[in-house]
Amino acid sequence: IGAVISAAGVLYARDKLDNILHVELDESSLAADNDISDYRNIVILGVDTRDMSNFSGSRTDSIIIVSINKTSGDIKLISVYRDSFLDIEGVGLDKVTHAFAYGGPERTINTLNRNLDLNITEFAALNFKTVAKVVDSVGGIDIDIKDDEISQMNTYLPETARYLKSDFEYITEA
């Protein structure tokens, strides 16, 4: 059920939020495995940029493949470790996070398809601000922290609030 909720959130965000990059991809450059017809695979890319209009030099901090079984409707989320060494076309072995810096979403999808035998032709790229909007749109997320984590959490609150243009309150108890 968690996968269904996650996928629904991603699709809602993809349609409703303005901080998600929409790009037409050159499908001939994606190296999609056309023999895979029973699954629709979409990649969600969490990028390390604050400016969604300029991805130059950005990397992916998070790579999640949403795999939808077309027959059963089952949805699986697969996280690809950002530091996995994969063969990046024209570069050689490198961390998959760097594929985005070398060629944006097309190079990243090409790398995933060629190395993992997938058929990805769709993606959503989100930055931190977009993730915050998605979380807000579902009413927030409760997290449990320990007393010894409060100080560290409070260190990041002012900068995060400034970036999101929002108010914050320091955490006083776990």
Which functions belong to the PLM regions below?
Residues 1-73:
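Entry/capping segment at the start of metal-dependent catalytic domains
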Residues 10, 103-104:
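Short secondary-structure boundary/capping elements
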Residues 37-40, 58-63, 72-80, 91, ...:
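Extracytoplasmic
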Residues 47-50, 68-73, 80-85, 101, ...:
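Solvent-exposed coil/turn segments that connect beta secondary-structure elements
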Residues 51-54, 94-102, 116-122:
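Second-shell loop/turn segments in exported
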Residues 76-103, 147, 158-162:
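Flexible, solvent-exposed short loops/turns enriched in glycine
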Residues 109, 113, 131-132:
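Generic structural marker for isolated residues within well-ordered, non-membrane alpha-helices
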Residues 136-174:
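Flexible, polar/acidic helix-loop-strand segments at domain edges
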